[in-house]
Each structure stands twice: as C-alpha cells, then as structure tokens.
C-alpha cells in the first residue's frame, strides 16, 4: 500500500499551478463521498517513483491531509506531452 503526505493548496489557478511545477510539485484533487472536494499539492519525485508501479493504479492509496488519513484510488492522470513529468492527478475517495 502507498502512503503520500500532501498539503492543501492555498492558491488556485494557472499561475499558482505553474509555480508549483517550478518548485517540483504538482496539483491534484480529491473528490467523491460525502465530503467536499479538496485541492492538494504533491511532491513530484516521490509520486513519480510510486506511479511507476502498477499497484499504484489498482490498489487504494492513503493520503495524509493535515494529519488525517484518507483512502483514495487514482481516477485520472495528466502527463506533460513530451517530458517525463506528471501534470495533475484526480483521486476518488473510496
């Protein structure tokens, strides 16, 4: 099982997302269930290492958001067109 420490995003929009990517992070969203959607930011290198394993897509992933654990599954992944970079991930609560 995979566990990822994440931070809640404070800024939204294209400029904020670009600043995240320059800082070797990328935006993501957690949605589904009874709770409201949450915009988060993840460290690119740690997620890229996990993402290379097939279990990342088939098993539940644990996100630690502000000290609270949330079980999610990967719903969608957006990648950079030609660089080996992740651009955005959608997580669905389980």
Curated annotation (Swiss-Prot):
GO terms for molecular function: 5S rRNA binding; structural constituent of ribosome. Transmembrane segments: none annotated. Keywords: Ribonucleoprotein, Ribosomal protein, RNA-binding, rRNA-binding. The keyword Ribosomal protein applies. One of its GO terms (biological process) is translation. InterPro entries: Rbsml_bL25/Gln-tRNA_synth_N, Ribosomal_bL25/Gln-tRNA_synth, Ribosomal_bL25_short, Ribosomal_L25_dom, Ribosomal_uL5_bac-type. GO terms for cellular component: cytosolic large ribosomal subunit. This is one of the proteins that binds to the 5S RNA in the ribosome where it forms part of the central protuberance. Belongs to the bacterial ribosomal protein bL25 family. HAMAP family: Ribosomal_bL25. Part of the 50S ribosomal subunit; part of the 5S rRNA/L5/L18/L25 subcomplex. Contacts the 5S rRNA. Binds to the 5S rRNA independently of L5 and L18. NCBIfam families: PRK05943.1. This is Large ribosomal subunit protein bL25. It comes from Serratia proteamaculans (strain 568).
